């Protein structure tokens, strides 16, 4: 597919990086030479210097015959104008990054009037992911599938976990809960486990099931299921505002610490139910006087990775039960994994995953296309959701044990008429099923791709 990305900052670069790996024809447009130099030296893309909302620049980029134009500059209005012009020039599909909460309320109208196919908001997406993780305190990541009927959670193994030292086949035979362990990370090794796999201390495991069954399994492992009732948020960013709204709906008490006076005033107006604290969130005296580390949860959301990392580690050492930090630099994210800090949030990667899913669905509009996509274990493994249709010749009505599945493909769960099925050898795929596939095979676009 011919794809134009307007804006090559952190978000645009992450999108370009993923889509070039998918072997698409990518053109990036930016008015900052430094952004283009980075893309030109590290990615297989065509770079064009200029304003992405300019007709002449879009024409030079080839918007007239583009399959998709993605506008992700730092200015909402520029993105909307770019998408409008590109669509009028002949681009088949357009996506715009829109961060302003006021525009968010008008998203449906914007899609209709401007012809947008998709509106993305990295800040809102990050806030929603943080809220999901806070609702599952034992997990370091939570990803919903099948409209929220099933979740995939990631968690680090602790010495007290009852699953340690036992094969998965032995563990699952007990049928404590209808769940499936579908992926694992051990050091630098990424594993799609079979029944002989034996979990070890410090392994990171990924498990699939309904919320109720996952809770049942975690409880059987000795994990605490106590709800996070109050959260301290460091930084008064847009993500903080969206997160505060999400947490307020769940009845969670929120404290937001922000140093900028004007931001504090805006936050106090937008978040009447939250406690807004003006001050330096890294100041030990402030932390003690406001008891910020006395909360059940701590979320570091400043614009500086270093500050987020240091404060998250301090919160962990102080005994805060659930700690999360926003990170943008890949090298920092690797460092954090080594510290065992746990939950790391990367807004740019969340959005890149969403757009990759959308692009794969466009590339396979006639078949059983990807409906959800989640990259785990550093992108080495993917979890994909498909809906089976009558086009699935060779896959439907056949017991899984008789299907010639590709090596590295695992069918983790099926949702049929609202009921979650953890598949066994005699399970079949039927039309209308939501099928969750976990694989280390890159670039699957159709459910049929699971066959060898």
Give the ranges of each region predicted by the language model.
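Cytosolic regulatory regions of ion transport systems
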Residues: 1-452
């Amino acid at each position: 597919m011919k794809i134009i990305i307007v804006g090559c900052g952190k978000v645009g670069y992450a999108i370009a990086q993923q889509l070039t790996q998918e072997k698409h024809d990518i053109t990036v447009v930016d008015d900052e030479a430094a952004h283009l130099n980075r893309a030109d030296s590290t990615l297989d893309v065509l770079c064009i210097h200029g304003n992405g909302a300019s007709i002449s620049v879009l024409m030079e980029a080839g918007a007239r015959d583009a399959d998709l134009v993605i506008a992700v500059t730092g200015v909402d209005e520029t993105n909307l104008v770019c998408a409008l012009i590109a669509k009028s020039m002949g681009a088949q599909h357009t996506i715009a990054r829109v961060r302003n909460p006021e525009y968010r309320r008008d998203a449906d109208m914007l899609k209709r009037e401007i012809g947008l196919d998709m509106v993305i908001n990295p800040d809102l997406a990050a806030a929603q992911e943080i809220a999901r993780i806070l609702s599952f305190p034992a997990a370091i990541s939570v990803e919903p599938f099948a409209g929220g009927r099933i979740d995939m959670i990631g968690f680090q193994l602790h010495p007290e976990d009852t699953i340690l030292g036992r094969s998965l086949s032995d563990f699952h035979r007990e049928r404590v809960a209808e769940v499936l362990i579908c992926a694992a990370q051990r050091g630098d090794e990424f594993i799609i486990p079979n029944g002989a796999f034996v979990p070890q201390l410090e392994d990171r495991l990924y498990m699939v099931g309904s919320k109720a069954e996952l809770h049942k399994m975690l409880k059987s492992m000795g994990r605490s299921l106590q709800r996070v009732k109050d959260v301290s948020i460091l930084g008064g960013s847009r993500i903080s505002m969206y997160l505060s709204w999400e947490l307020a709906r769940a009845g969670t008490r929120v404290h937001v610490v922000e140093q900028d006076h004007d931001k504090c005033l805006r936050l106090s107006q937008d978040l009447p139910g939250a406690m807004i604290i003006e001050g330096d969130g890294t100041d030990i005296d402030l932390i003690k006087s406001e008891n910020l580390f006395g909360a059940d949860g701590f979320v570091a959301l400043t614009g500086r990775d270093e500050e987020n990392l240091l404060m998250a580690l301090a919160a962990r050492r102080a005994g805060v039960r659930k700690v999360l930090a926003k990170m943008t630099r890949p090298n920092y994210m690797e460092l954090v994994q080594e510290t065992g800090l746990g939950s790391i949030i990367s807004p740019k990667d969340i959005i890149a995953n969403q757009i990759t899913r959308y692009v794969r669905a466009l590339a396979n509009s006639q078949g059983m296309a990807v409906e959800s996509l989640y990259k785990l274990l550093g992108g080495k493994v993917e979890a994909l959701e498909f809906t089976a249709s009558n086009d699935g010749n060779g896959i439907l009505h056949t017991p899984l044990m008789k299907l010639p599945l590709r090596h590295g493909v695992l069918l983790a769960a099926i949702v049929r008429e609202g009921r979650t099925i953890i598949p066994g050898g005699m399970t079949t795929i039927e039309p209308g099923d939501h099928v969750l596939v976990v694989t280390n095979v890159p670039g699957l676009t159709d459910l049929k791709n699971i066959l060898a």
